[in-house]
């Protein structure tokens, strides 16, 4: 019945309104652990971070059967909107995990770096690195020639606390490294060219 379709659209509008109202106020993290299709896929795209599980989660507006009917093209759920597609091509997902348990662990780790709301500071963690720690790698890694490349992952690992780095969108724009780390126990954002 047509009125049920209208009610569904109204429900989506309410969800999107809540996404917008919460934006910049609380962290919004979408965990996609199974199929997500139709209007429901817009909400994860509006959240701050999205995680998908490999092989079990899919996000697309219209599934493979409709694509086949309309275009004649055979496409799998994975190729249409699987975790690897959204991690490497569309950029909609920020993290991928092999299992749901691994996905939840990544979300917990992410939450350890960011404030719970816009009125709080990011969590401060006791730093176990010595305050006067020196890493000779930093004296050697950057080559004398400005045209010779070097690995920014090594630089990042050498300067952050305990080498702990949570990379965001690691499969998207491979020339760019973004993520979270800590320096002296304080959360920092990292942006680097690779």
Each PLM stretch: what is its role?
Residues 1-119:
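Conserved catalytic cores of soluble enzyme domains
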Residues 1, 23-25, 68, 86-88, ...:
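Gly-rich Lys/Arg/Thr-decorated short loops/hinges at beta-loop-alpha junctions or inter-strand turns
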Residues 7, 19, 117-118, 126, ...:
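Detector for Asparagine
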Residues 48, 74, 79, 129-136, ...:
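Acidic-enriched, low-complexity/disordered segments with a strong bias for Aspartate over Glutamate
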Residues 4, 67, 90, 110-111, ...:
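Short amphipathic alpha-helical patches
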Residues 34, 69, 106, 122-130, ...:
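A sequence-level detector of short, solvent-exposed, charge-rich linear segments
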């Amino acid at each position: 019945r047509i009125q049920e379709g209208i009610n569904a659209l109204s429900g989506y509008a309410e969800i999107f309104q809540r996404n917008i109202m919460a934006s910049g106020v609380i962290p919004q993290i979408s965990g996609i652990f199974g199929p997500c299709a139709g209007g429901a896929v817009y909400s994860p795209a509006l959240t701050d971070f999205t995680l998908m599980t490999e092989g079990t989660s899919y996000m697309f507006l219209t599934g493979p059967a409709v694509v086949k009917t309309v275009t004649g093209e055979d496409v799998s759920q994975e190729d249409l909107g699987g975790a690897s597609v959204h991690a490497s091509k569309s950029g909609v997902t920020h993290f991928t995990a092999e299992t749901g348990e691994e996905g939840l662990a990544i979300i917990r780790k992410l939450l350890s770096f960011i404030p719970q709301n816009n009125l709080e500071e990011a969590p401060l963690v006791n730093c176990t690195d010595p305050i006067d720690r020196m890493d000779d790698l930093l004296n050697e890694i950057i080559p004398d020639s400005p045209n010779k490349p070097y690995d920014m992952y090594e630089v990042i690992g050498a300067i952050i606390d305990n080498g702990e780095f949570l990379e965001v969108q690691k499969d998207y724009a491979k020339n760019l490294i973004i993520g979270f780390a800590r320096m002296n126990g304080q959360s920092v954002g990292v942006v680097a060219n690779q």
